[in-house]
Amino acid sequence: MKEKKTKRRVWRGVATTGTSLLALSLSASMVIDTFRTDIDKFLGTQSTQMVTDNQTEDDYTYKSDYSSTTELLDSIEDLGERMSEEGTVLLKNNGALPLSADEKKKVTFLGFSSYFPIQGGDFGSSLVENKGTDADTVDMVQAFEAKGYSLNPTVQQMYEGMKEDFKSEAVLPWGVVTYYRATAPAVGGTFTSLEPSQEKLDKAEPTWKDSMNDYNVMIVTIARAAGENANYTPGEEGVNPEQNLNQADPLGLSDTERATIDAAVKAKAENGGKVIVLLNNASAMEIDELKNNDGIDAMLEVGIPGGYGFYGVADVLSGDANPSGHLADTYAVDNSASPAAQNYGDYEWTNADSDYSINSEIVEAESIYAGYKYYETRYVDTVLGQGNASDSVGSSTGGAWTYNSEVS
């Protein structure tokens, strides 16, 4: 009996030890495999080897077209500049452009977006800055100065001193991101204009209007951001009601933006200068009042230029490049009058679960007739006298629908 008990204890000990070693081995294997790369680096070993048939030395060698990193960065900068030159659209020019060499030396930037422009999307296609490289990304001020423009220092210091007033937030799926520029409202939200009032500007710098006598080429930038998870609700519903800025649509002008343009037009009447409007946006704006404003000498759509595109904008204004771009969207007189705007909104499900970030939908009932397809098709129908196309439904004037009254 004693011998049997001894054997049992031995086997139990062996089994326990074996089980422990097996568990330790499995755990160690998983740990080693997880940190295999670091262990190989430390020991100077190699865990894997890739073997292919007919392998040659250059099979997996990428051959660059550039001889150095500097040359690569210069090429990226050049591409960004040329894209902006070729994509800029000249919407209006009453003999104001191109600017002469003398006019380049007396430029006033107006509008906070001249100093804090939109260069990328709020979420996706956002600006990736290069700093401390051979091709640093530049904003509008830096680009124009690099191209030989002289800017009104009084107005520049005024706007840059108000930087904190231009802080805005973009609501992204993982949280809120802060920008110092215009941002688009979240889906279902309202647009808030950050353009400062004339009273605020006068308080910040009482002499800013007088300073334009010496810098009488006035460039006003109007901006609207864009991005994923952000949209503009058409009509007054999409505008912050607390501001009371006589803004009929988030993509239309606010009274503070109108006042900035009016200040430039008034200064021009006194100093004999020029007024140029730049549209810095990725969403088609309501620009009819800008087009019809005789005080505005030129207007350009510059889009969202990225890290180097403002070099190209500066070249377009001076005539060193031609604005060969064409609009990719229809610029409607009234965005809210189009069929696509009728079903737009943030319509949540009745049984929405707050734990999920997507609880809404939009019913697209207009089929393919969105944007230019709607306007061009309805125009043809008015010419042919069919489909009740001349009816007042969808007319921004309240009268018979006409193409020229609906498209800027």
Task: Please tell me what each predicted stretch does.
Residues 1-408:
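C-terminal non-catalytic regions of proteins with extracellular/luminal or membrane-system context
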